[in-house]
Amino acid sequence: MEATQFQTMLEERGILLSSRALAQFERYYELLVEWNEKMNLTAITDKPGVYVKHFFDSVSPAFYYDFSAPLALCDVGSGAGFPSLPLKICFPHLRVSIVDSLQKRIRFLEHLITELGLADVALYHERAETFARQKGMRESFDVVTARAVARMPVLVELCLPLVKMGGTFIAMKAASALEELKEGNKAISVLGGEVTATETFTLPFDEGERTIIFIQKMRKTPNQYPRKPGTPNKQPIQ
C-alpha cells in the first residue's frame, strides 16, 4: 500500500485526509524506520506493511466510532504511537494522552510529535496501574484505546479505570479476540463496563483479520482497581 492507496481507502470509509495529513503520515514512516535502527519500535519496516498494519489498522476504530467531536483520548501502552497518533493526524482536534512504561519510546514520541507539528498531545512515562490512580486522570477520558497490549482480563483492569462514565474503551485485537473476550467478561463487569459492539474486518490485501471491541463505562470502577503494578498480569480478574 502506498500513500495514495491509503488515502483512497480511507476516503471510501468516509475519512478525508488533507495534504498536510498525508505529509505527516509520510514523515511518520520515515522517522519510525530511522529510529527503529536505534531501538526496537516495530518488526514491520517496509513501507506497504507500515501503511497497512500500523497506519490503516490504527485508524480503523474510526470506521465504527465517531471521532468528529473534540474528545479526550488516552492511549495505554502505545509503543510507537499506535493507534493514537494516526487517529490524531486524521482528527487533529483530538486531545491525546499517551501512557507508556518505557522511557526510550517516550523519547521517540517526543521527537515525533515535534516533527509532525502535533498539538494537544501529552506524554506520560508511567505504568498504567499507577497512572489510573492519579487524581485528574482516573475516570477522566472520553475514549481509552489499547492495541495488542495484553489479554482482555488484564487490559480491562489497566484501561477501564481511566474511562469516564459514559465513555468508551476501545480494545484492538487480532482474529482470536472473541474467545479472549469471554475470558474478560468478569473483569469487564467488575470494573464497571459493558460490551456494546464487536467489529471484525480484514486488513487490505488480506494482511490479517482484526477485531475491535467497544466497551462502555456504565458504573464507576471500584476504588481497589487497578491493583499495584504487576498484579493484574499475575492474578487477572477471572
Curated annotation (Swiss-Prot):
It is an enzyme of class 2 (transferase). GO terms for molecular function: rRNA (guanine-N7-)-methyltransferase activity. InterPro entries: rRNA_ssu_MeTfrase_G (IPR003682), SAM-dependent_MTases_sf (IPR029063). Its EC number is 2.1.1.-. Keywords: Cytoplasm, Methyltransferase, rRNA processing, S-adenosyl-L-methionine, Transferase. Its main location: cytoplasm. S-adenosyl-L-methionine binds at residues 77, 82, 128-129, 147. It comes from the Bacteria. It is found in: Cytoplasm. GO terms for cellular component: cytosol. Specifically methylates the N7 position of guanine in position 535 of 16S rRNA. Belongs to the methyltransferase superfamily. RNA methyltransferase RsmG family. HAMAP family: 16SrRNA_methyltr_G. This is Ribosomal RNA small subunit methyltransferase G. It comes from Geobacillus kaustophilus (strain HTA426). The gene is rsmG.
